[in-house]
Amino acid sequence: MLKLFSAFRKDKIWDFDGGIHPPEMKTQSNGTPLRQVPLAPRFVIPLKQHIGAEGELCVSVGDRVLRGQALTRGRGRMLPVHAPTSGTVIAIAPHSTAHPSALAELSVIIDADGEDRWIEREGWSDYRAHSREALIERIHQYGVAGLGGAGFPTGVKLQGGGDKITTLIINAAECEPYITADDRLMQDCAAQIVEGIRILAHILQPREVLIGIEDNKPQAISMLRAVLADAHDISLRVIPTKYPSGGAKQLTQILTGKQVPHGGRSSDIGVLMQNVGTAYAVKRAVVDGEPITERVVTLTGEAVSRPGNVWARLGTPVRHLLNDAGFCPSADQMVIMGGPLMGFTLPWLDVPVVKITNCLLAPSVTEMGAPQEEKSCIRCSACADACPADLLPQQLYWFSKGQQHDKATAHHIADCIECGACAWVCPSNIPLVQYFRQEKAEINAIRLEEKRAAEAKARFEARQARLEREKAARLARHKSAAVQPAAKDQDAIAAALARVKEKQAQATQPVVIQAGSLPDNSAVIAAREARKAQARAKQAAHPVADSAIPGDDPRKAAVEAAIARAKARKQEQQAGSEPAEPVDPRKAAVEAAIARAKARKQEQQAGSEPAEAVDPRKAAVEAAIARAKARKQEQQAGGEPAEAVDPRKAAVEAAIARAKARKQEQQTGSEPAEPVDPRKAAVEAAIARAKARKQEQQAGSEPAEPADPRKAAVAAAIARVQAKKAAQQQVVNED
């Protein structure tokens, strides 16, 4: 009983809802064998002949190509295309292709040389010796795609199936009227088709392989049964003729009883389907090593005098094929690529044959009938009864016409297979399929725009996040940079304090000076002698020109003479009235060093600077002021106790004085000489002498005030500065 049930289950077929029975019109073309078409002089090969992106070009204009040579590289879902014949690439430009709107796509245009030479072909006769991955890659690189109409890359489809495929279905139904390409291919090439099916089964390793064919193809059924007479791995299932039983979901339900869920694929239920033409192309790619460069195309219709099925090279213009079949166009002739229900009308005949082209229908006016006017929907539900996908075409029509995309999506418009059964039975002659195609295209465009917007938003948010991270990092760097200098300053302050403490500690140490001993200044003396020798060497290397020696400055000489006389008188008075003060060796050494430095500086200035003009008036004034201050200092006398002498500090100060003196020796300058007016100088000298006498009289009559040597020195310096400024102003006025 169980065996009987299994046998019944093995040969059982199911049915699907809906469907129609239009006139088949297949006898026009299925009675003649396949034939070759003469080569066209020019071929147009679109880069995209499948679902997915176009491949990357690997040829350029002017290249010579052979038949089967790859024109593009296939990576991922990109499927390569190959040259249909040998010739020369004359252009790579957009060209109208097989599309309802005749959209222009990038194409390679080849001028045939008539030789039709193949590339070197390498077949895998023992395909079982190769791995599954190698077979899939070969199928993909040889450009095999679904030849039943979808054009999905076969290699990608096989790769996606993986190990979850339990049933492999070969679609041989070919249910649409007029089309007999698969029927004729099964009659003439049944053995090659079965070999291709076994290659697919070897790759997928399914539990069962089923061939579904309609009962209106008796010759093809007999040929397949003859080839499968001794085969137990492939089952042939003959199904009733009903349109659209050749749809993937419908044939799956007929052969397995399983329904593909809404929005899903047949692989979700463990089923993978391939067309008989695809199986034949797989055999030629794997066993013969031939890329897909041609396919079977049905040429039919009453406008064609010699209908039949031909081997058409990919890229052949439609006009060339129809002319070879005896095309006799009428005034308003239409040409349909595909069948009368799922095909589309070509805007012109220069479009090329591609991988999904299975039929070229050229009907007469009487054959297609007069065009009828579209009327309003009467909601008769005939379209819903005929729909094989269990949809509501009348609702989808209203949603599509009203641009209600969300409702159309909710009513599963994506599951529409565009079979045309609803439009066939519509009494109002509404082209429902055209509305559904347009609505699905608009929905796809909206989804694509939403995807692009989401990607743009993601990029913007990523950019904003990156900018925020960079800003935070920049602020952190600024904060660390602001903290680091403070730490460095603290370190510097601490180091300075340490040095001060060290100096204070050294200063507090007692200095022991033995009686009658002198400080050891040998190191300082040696350094001084070395510097003197270095200075003498520099002077010898740079001798001073004798012509640059200027005359003495009478103003400075008078001031210094007056100061010297005042100091001399003061010393005489102190020597006569006060006891002698002890001599401070440190101060004496400092003063001597300063005197030597001044002397050297004057020598260098005399050697490098031009003589300055002497202002006798100001010189006399300064001399008188100096003499008055000297007399005041003479009248002042006092005594201060002698300070203790620190020999170490005296030596340090003497060394510092000598260093300053040498530094002043190295500095040189030059000032331009100012002109002297003898007449004005004599007048100013007389005025100065009068002022000096007046100051002497005032000094003799007024009581003497205590003199401050520091203020006297400051006053003398101010007098010298004013004298220089007055001389400069005089020169400006004279100019």
UniProtKB/Swiss-Prot annotation:
[4Fe-4S] cluster 2 binds at C387, C416, C419, C422. Pfam families: Complex1_51K, Fer4_7, RnfC_N, SLBB. GO terms for molecular function: 4 iron, 4 sulfur cluster binding; electron transfer activity; metal ion binding. Gene3D superfamilies: 3.30.70.20, NADH-ubiquinone oxidoreductase 51kDa subunit. Keywords: 4Fe-4S, Cell inner membrane, Cell membrane, Electron transport, Iron, Iron-sulfur, Membrane, Metal-binding, Repeat, Translocase, Transport. One of its GO terms (biological process) is electron transport chain. It is a peripheral membrane protein. Residues 534-714 are annotated as: Disordered. Binds 2 [4Fe-4S] clusters per subunit. [4Fe-4S] cluster 1 binds at C377, C380, C383, C426. It is an enzyme of class 7 (translocase). PROSITE patterns: 4FE4S_FER_1, 4FE4S_FER_2. It is found in: Cell inner membrane. Residues 368-397, 407-436 form the 4Fe-4S ferredoxin-type domain. Its cofactor is [4Fe-4S] cluster. Its EC number is 7.-.-.-. HAMAP family: RsxC_RnfC. The complex is composed of six subunits: RsxA, RsxB, RsxC, RsxD, RsxE and RsxG. Part of a membrane-bound complex that couples electron transfer with translocation of ions across the membrane. Required to maintain the reduced state of SoxR. Belongs to the 4Fe4S bacterial-type ferredoxin family. RnfC subfamily. This is Ion-translocating oxidoreductase complex subunit C. It comes from Salmonella heidelberg (strain SL476). The gene is rsxC.
